[in-house]
């Protein structure tokens, strides 16, 4: 807030709008959608006053992200179509495909928007092209994050930039099963082999029952 006041007093609407965009994006990522939308709408107006189509497009993209997370698909058609058109016409596609200061901290968070646009025909050909540049042209759905695994040293799984804690797994055996399948990813295991690895001391009937739970 202080940065905006200083920028406004100096007559620098662009810096003020940039700060509003950054605040709005941060609030969107924190799932504080109502507050985020207020900041972003003000950023859109500010960038419009400054004749900055890039900033305006970035702010509107974050609005689309929030509407999609809230399943307000009816609000998306016009704005997402216009955002994609602006990206196509001005080479702003990197907002969807790479990490950037005004875009995503994880480029996968906007993939669900691209899948929706492709399927609904909202700049569908361009949305498909962006998906293909990510190697995701054929996906039918996407969670909106990249899953990364660290196996050297302590085992760690990250959902986007967020590390999943040990207690974040519903069951400890789920974590162990994931590790097992990762270890033997080139050698498919059948159910009996998995049960032997996870419950070596259990009789077959008990192991089978544990596997189903």
Located regions from the model:
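Intrinsically disordered, low-complexity protein-interaction/activation regions
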Residues: 18, 123-213
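TPR/TPR-like alpha-solenoid helical repeat scaffolds
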Residues: 19, 58-61, 93-117, 127-135
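TPR/TPR-like (Sel1-like) alpha-helical repeat modules
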Residues: 74-92, 111-122
